[in-house]
Amino acid sequence: MGVAKLTDQNTLVPDSKYAHVERERRYLLEDLPEGLTRAEHHLQITDNYITGTRLRIRKVRDPRTNKWVVKFTQKFAPNPNDFSRTIITNTYLSAIEAEMLSMFNANEIRKNRYKFEFGGRTFSIDMFLGDLFGLVLAETGFESDEEMANFPLPAFAHS
């Protein structure tokens, strides 16, 4: 009798009190929305997506305080055809834990994240850096599928 091996087919991801559903819409922008400038407060985010997994290490720096938050995240879409709903689990890491996990091969994405209020909602506006320089995305979250389905395209976004 051989040793049982883990595969995607025989490994379950059970419901967890630590994981939650994220409902988000993302929109492509040409630039920052009118009224928001690069000089405004933002967070500097570095995401390292561990090759071959659904895992990332996210480092978030507030340039006003020079303080960091580091999260180890699993994020996946239960329906591979619908990325508007994802299951996300975060674990906060110490600097030593983050350094230990940095040994894994990963694809890095860097961006500056701005908060933007529009139409009674808060949007995160991401301006990408490095290889994705010039890409600007807006995202906003929803409490329910119905709220998400009925939300109109914001005036500052492309269809």
Q: Where do the protein language model's features map onto the residues?
A:
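Phosphate-end processing signature that detects enzymes handling 5′-triphosphorylated RNA
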Residues: 2-159
